[in-house]
A protein has these predicted regions:
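C-terminal scaffold of the Radical SAM
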Residues: 3-5, 24-50, 56-340
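Short active-site neighborhood of thiol/selenol oxidoreductases, capturing the structured segment around
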Residues: 6-10
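Local cysteine-cluster metal-coordination motifs and their immediate loop/turn environment
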Residues: 11-24
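Short amphipathic alpha-helical interaction segments
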Residues: 339-351
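A short, conserved structural fragment
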Residues: 353-363
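Short, amphipathic alpha-helical interaction segments positioned at domain boundaries
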Residues: 370-384
Length: 384
């Protein structure tokens, strides 16, 4: 069976950003911390009934929303409860997402003392003008201060989230953001292009974005700068110093399993290969999530929140994840993780190799430089 991770979703934010299509809700009248932790542990207990064998969790990721809005006491109770229900690897990577507006020194020292060993800080830009347009509640100065607080609290594994292709952003401004991030010496940088997603304010009222050519040029210049400073790209939008790739995200991209608990969380669990891989989905509304009741374990597999992945869908699901990684996948991994013969990747695989979109080297398949820019085209071939 593949490695397994745990994703925990915290759906509350100080305010909803206009570009955000994640399941996040502005805090209106306080956060029901105690009830939510109870619900998370109940949810986890229930999901464990789907496992066909004991599994050891190699990473935990607390995402949102803004998980750092929760108190250290609430997260302590949550992590203690998880420790009683799950076996965690000795070097388990435990990540907490945090936004610069929520940083207090004492609070983050306590988070570190709980065993949280990686922080992911949602900075997005170091330019106050762009932060304002993005609806962020922090300033550039607060972003820099947050990184300082994190380092002083003992966090030596730190990701900074940044975006490019922002409304009216110039190439020089995008480069400036990357230079500011590098100067803070994080171990990992996530660098995403802003996209206008359905069901967001920006989608309804689109801001003026730079031309595609300008976005592409800015991206290439920033990538070069990251490489020069020791940040090696290992996924479409992820750059890490040696030894600091995100174990949790790598597990997603390598078609690993993950338990997903919390409002709107998704999971993937391999019960047996190739015919018994399931996806789980939880109610998106925090109110509904807090009220939900759980069927007995025997009914769990047929409940509406659990869906089997059809075998014919496995090739595209596998390719969709693995081809985001610079080193792609081996045909042996494909067989091991899906239970299917590499022949099931045809005819798409041969077509992509012939068109120079994919490269095959010693039984490894990965995107060519050209394919990297046409990932959507590659995936369409696997879908057909």
């Amino acid at each position: 069976l593949p490695p397994i991770s745990l994703y925990i979703h915290f759906p509350w934010c100080i305010q909803k950003c206009p570009y955000c299509d994640f399941n996040s809700h502005a805090v209106k009248a306080g956060i029901p911390e105690h009830d939510y932790v109870d619900a998370l542990l109940k949810d986890l207990r229930n999901d464990l009934s789907l496992l066909t064998a004991p599994r050891t969790v190699s990473s935990i990721f607390m995402g949102g929303g803004t998980p750092s809005l929760f108190s250290p006491e609430a997260l302590d109770r949550l992590l203690a409860g998880i420790g009683q229900l799950l076996s965690l690897s000795e070097d388990c990577e435990i990540t907490l997402e945090a936004n610069p507006g929520t940083f207090e020194s004492a609070k983050f020292r306590e988070f570190r003392a709980l065993g949280i060993n990686r922080l992911s800080i949602g900075i997005q830009s170091f330019d106050d003008r762009h932060l304002k347009k993005l609806g962020r509640v922090h300033s550039a100065a607060e972003a820099i201060k947050a990184v300082e607080i994190a380092a002083n609290a003992g966090f030596d594994n730190l990701n900074l989230d940044l975006m490019f292709g922002l409304p009216e952003q110039t190439e020089a401004e995008a480069i400036g953001d990357i230079q500011s991030a590098i100067a803070l010496n994080p171990t990992h940088i996530s660098f995403y292009q802003l996209t206008l997603e359905p069901n967001t304010y920006f989608y309804k009222f689109p801001p003026k974005l730079p031309e595609d050519e300008a976005i592409f040029a800015a991206q290439k210049a920033c990538q070069q700068l990251l490489a020069e400073h020791g940040y090696r790209q290992y996924e479409i939008s992820a750059y890490a110093k040696v030894g600091f790739q995100s174990r949790h995200n790598r597990n997603y991209w390598q078609f690993g399993d993950y338990l997903g608990i919390g409002a709107g969380a998704h999971g993937k669990i391999t019960r047996a290969l190739p015919h018994d891989i399931v996806r789980t989905a939880k109610p998106k509304s925090p109110e509904q999530y807090l009220k939900q009741t759980y069927p007995s374990a025997s009914l769990r597999i047929s409940s509406p929140s659990v869906e089997a992945i059809p075998v014919e869908q496995l090739p595209v699901e596998f390719a969709m994840n693995h081809l985001r990684l610079t080193n792609g996948f081996s045909l042996a991994d494909y067989q091991r993780l899906t239970g299917l013969s590499p022949d099931t990747l045809e005819p798409a695989l041969t077509q992509c190799l012939e068109q120079g979109l994919l490269v095959k080297q010693q039984q490894r398949i990965f995107c060519s430089d050209k394919g990297w820019d046409f990932l959507d085209v590659i995936l369409e071939k696997f879908i057909r």
